């Protein structure tokens, strides 16, 4: 009975360690993707605000209302 429990433990622990390492790696990859998405959104916001700001200056310059 003891040898059966010992063999089950020898199979169980490496499996759980391997699983936790895979989950850590997956979490790290997701964090990298999230950072890349956040950077792209920040760039898009910067471009959009720059375009809108330039548009306002053009409208003010052409209409003379500002």
Swiss-Prot record:
Subcellular locations according to the entry: Secreted
Pfam families: Antimicrobial22 (PF16047), FSAP_sig_propep (PF03032)
BP terms from Gene Ontology: defense response to Gram-negative bacterium; defense response to Gram-positive bacterium
Keywords linked to the UniProt accession: Amphibian defense peptide, Antibiotic, Antimicrobial, Cleavage on pair of basic residues, Disulfide bond, Secreted, Signal
Lineage top rank: taxon: Eukaryota
Disulfide bonds, paired cysteine numbers: 60-66
Alphabetical list of InterPro entries matching this protein: Frog_antimicrobial_propeptide, Nigrocin
One Gene Ontology cellular component: extracellular region
Function field: Antimicrobial peptide active at least against the Gram-positive bacterium S.aureus but with otherwise unclear activity spectrum. Lacks hemolytic activity against rabbit or human erythrocytes.
Similarity comment text for this entry: Belongs to the frog skin active peptide (FSAP) family. Brevinin subfamily.
Name this protein carries in UniProt: Nigrocin-2GRa
Lineage, broadest ranks: Eukaryota, Metazoa, Chordata, Craniata, Vertebrata
């Amino acid at each position: 009975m003891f040898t059966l429990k010992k063999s089950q433990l020898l199979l169980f622990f490496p499996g759980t360690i391997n699983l936790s390492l895979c989950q850590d790696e997956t979490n790290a990859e997701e964090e990298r993707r999230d950072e890349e998405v956040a950077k792209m959104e920040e760039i898009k916001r910067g471009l959009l605000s720059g375009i809108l700001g330039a548009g306002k200056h053009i409208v003010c310059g052409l209409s003379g209302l500002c």
